[in-house]
Amino acid sequence: TSRLVGSEMCIRDRNMTAKTITLSNGLTILLDHFNSNTLSIGLWLNVGSVNENNKQLGIAHMLEHMAFKGTKNRNAFDISKEIEDVGGDINAYTSKENTAYYVKLLPSNHELGIEILSDIFLNSTFPKEEIERERGVIISEIGQSNDMPDDKVFDKFYSLAYQNQSIGKPILGTKVSVGGFNKDDLKEFCNQNYNPSNLIIGISGKSVSYTHLTLPTIDRV
């Protein structure tokens, strides 16, 4: 168990007090306390489609999907059920420059939220059958995106503005690239990019005293 210790910086205004803490392993923790009946906890990674090479188009997004599909401790059903059983919500998204995983729940359940986010970050197993299932889901998403004028304009703009650069490539990837990913590809991208120096843990809302907050799994990050 680790206490929240490290270099600190406080940001204050009339409505909230935010504190950032940087640990020795490079991980940053952002604590934003304000009067709310709920709590949001998130993992924000400085990793997105911009980190992909031409053979990896869409892998950051697929890795985000696969994070919810099983760990060493939970299967896909358990990950959702444990959060939903306490009235919470868990979700994620991938952008060109970031990937985020987050939960929203009651302050009294903050340890559960931290535990599950830590589990999917540290212990995802990428089951082969789930890879095939999510491959189909994402290829369907690509087809839907190709039928949406707004998405087509967005992708075209970026491809012209950032020619021959990864930021100009589509976040979802292509049917060909997504169709070729396997477990080793996902693990390699994860090992290269999912590390403490790329990670911000954000905790926002009404919570227990932040000076006494413990992160049970932070030593393993």
Please place each PLM-identified region on the residue numbering:
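Charge-rich, well-structured scaffold segments of protease-associated domains
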Residues: T22, A76-L213
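Residue-level micro-sites within transmembrane alpha helices that shape
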Residues: S2, A60-E64, R133, I218-D219
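Charged, solvent-exposed alpha-helical segments that act as regulatory interaction surfaces
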Residues: K72, F126-P127, V221
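Single conserved hydrophobic/aromatic residue that forms the stacking wall/gate
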Residues: T1-D13, H212-V221
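Short basic coil micro-motifs at the edges of alpha-helical modules that engage polyanionic partners
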Residues: T1, T20, T71, K175-V178
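His/Glu-rich zincin catalytic helix
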Residues: R12-D78, K187-L213
